[in-house]
From Swiss-Prot:
The keyword Cell inner membrane does not apply. This is Protein Wnt-2. Palmitoleoylation is required for efficient binding to frizzled receptors. Depalmitoleoylation leads to Wnt signaling pathway inhibition. It comes from Microcebus murinus. One of its GO terms (molecular function) is frizzled binding. The keyword Transmembrane helix does not apply. Keywords: Developmental protein, Disulfide bond, Extracellular matrix, Glycoprotein, Lipoprotein, Secreted, Signal, Wnt signaling pathway. InterPro entries: Wnt, Wnt2, Wnt_C, Wnt_CS. Belongs to the Wnt family. It is found in: Secreted, Extracellular space, Extracellular matrix; Secreted.
Amino acid sequence: MNAPLGGIWLWLPLLLTWLTPEVSSSWWYMRATGGSSRVMCDNVPGLVSRQRQLCHRHPDVMRAISLGVSEWTAECQHQFRQHRWNCNTLDRDHSLFGRVLLRSSRESAFVYAISSAGVVFAITRACSQGELKSCSCDPKKKGTAKDSKGTFDWGGCSDNIDYGIKFARAFVDAKERKGKDARALMNLHNNRAGRKAVKRFLKQECKCHGVSGSCTLRTCWLAMADFRKTGAYLWRKYNGAIQVVMNQDGTGFTVANKRFKKPTKNDLVYFENSPDYCIRDREAGSLGTAGRVCNLTSRGMDSCEVMCCGRGYDTSRVTRMTKCECKFHWCCAVRCQDCLEALDVHTCKAPKNADWATPT
């Protein structure tokens, strides 16, 4: 009897810290606060001392981060637009996403990664646009260099992504570094995966100089790709996310299923399976799919069968204004008529009990 009891006591601290509810990244709420930087720094709930310190010290960076929140939440919603959970946000909730991210799920892994990536992208872009006092274009990209096409001169303004990554790591990871629990380690891993994703799509752009564009001389610079590429990449990582458990000394992960490979620094990791998101459930933070538009002809996640969780759907006839009878006129315009188009819209039926689900 002693050995099993000893094993239980060994794992009990890890289990208790695993279940901690303090997992929301309160800096996400910076989108909703607005106002001056001082007001923002003092009124965003849940910032740790290091985050408030950086907030007061770098108000211009905070403005860039707060503007970036809308960008990465929009990207999250784009990637999940055909899924039961569609990355919906709650404007009056300081965690931005409500209770749904209290679960250490795939969705949590994606949100932490895309938000960390969004901070890198927003700061780096602000650096290149001359909006920040603490950084500018990448100072290392000077002089002459060589690539597969020959020599070129560094010119223009190379995106200073190393500064963006460094500041994002200091600000975003500050709260997680104060904790030693399993969820903090999960968040740190996914935060890093998000930062690395932005740098993955840094590309070299060049301009040719010479007679008739002969490219005798080239001037090149490094530029971030559109954030959609980062979002699509992290979406693929979400679909291939690896379920993990804590190792015995509580310092890292091991795969939950031994048939799968160990996660790399680029992979997303999670602990818990996701709910089905079919019905409104206050405890799970699920808004359900009642009223969601579904695709009658699709066989994917947006199909009426999958989106509506087998509850069926309602169909309504709606009209919308579209462009029609378009003709090309010389030179150089396309002129169209405005036409009314009737189409059927299918929306998921509500469950028989439309109230908030009561957990049993």
